[in-house]
Amino acid sequence: MKKGYIKLIAAVILGVAIIGGGIYGVYTLLSSNTTTILYRSTVDDKINAIRPYIVALDSYNAYSVAYANQLQPTLEELRNGSHNTTITLPKYKDLKTALEAAKQDSPTPYEDVNQSTNDVLAVLDQLIPVADQLQAYYVERRFEKDNFKGSDELAAQYVPLAEQFYATYNALDLALDNRNNELYTERMTEYQGEKRENAVNFIELNLMTAQTIDLIDPDGNTDTQKVEANLQQITQRINKLQPGTTSETQNAVREYQDSVKEFVAEARNYIIINSSYGEAYTQLFIKYNKMVGKANVVNMVELDATDQKKK
């Protein structure tokens, strides 16, 4: 995971699916009972189990990418002992609240996700009080009285904890990303068996765009030929994507297609022209994250006209 630019996770969105004879919404949990949740077995159950964790990280990541040009300099200044009159810190408290709620309401069947969540929360318990003190120090402009002595003392506590947080957070992000991709693959296998070719194409598009953003390295080690080959395949697939069976899904697909095309153009410009421009990598991630947001609105269940719908 590239430090400072943690991509949003393309969540598996079901919209409303028919499960076991009943209507089951994407945010609905089978049960709050831990034993029941841990022994879920269907793809839908597992999707709903990890969904709150993905939502928690999506929110944190969106802020982190949007304010990377302030968050990264703040950390570097605190690490190096250089001083500024303002600081920008990540939204640690919001992440902690969201992860605690996810852990309470939706235990997952994945030990790596559960353990990584516990690790992140353990670090946040130590990090948040120091971050609060640091924020208050700068808001109250105490540096005007002590010539940044208090800042240096708090930074000595904050920086090691922040580094520890990034390590544990990246582990959780990676675990969720891997599990999410597994669920995409499981869902795709089901759809292949049901001859849902449009939904399969949609899933493969999301997997390919995720692979592409991971291939692009801001340090100059990008395999540009591989990226370009992916972009060409993405373009072919997005042009083949059909609009779906309902007006709502058709609108969502059109917006998704437009967003994918924007991402392809941005990625191509980056590897050809803009890779030496520092802000270009952030802008590429913003385009990617926008595309993920559009993908999450598409109801895969309504992408193909099934035999049941045709009757």
Show where each model-derived region lies.
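N-terminal Sec-pathway targeting helices
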Residues: 2-15
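Hydrophobic alpha-helical membrane-insertion segments, chiefly the h-region
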Residues: 12, 16-27
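Immediate post-signal-peptide N-terminus of mature secreted/exported proteins
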Residues: 29-84, 152-159, 174, 186-207, ...
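N-terminal Sec/ER secretory leader and immediately downstream segment
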Residues: 44-150
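Secondary-structure edge/capping motif, primarily at the C-terminal ends of alpha-helices
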Residues: 64-78, 102-109, 131-145, 179, ...
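Polar/charged, Q/E/K-enriched amphipathic alpha-helical segments with strong coiled-coil propensity
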Residues: 132-163, 271-285, 289
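Extended amphipathic alpha-helical interaction segments
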Residues: 151-257
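A cross-kingdom marker for long, charged
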Residues: 229-311
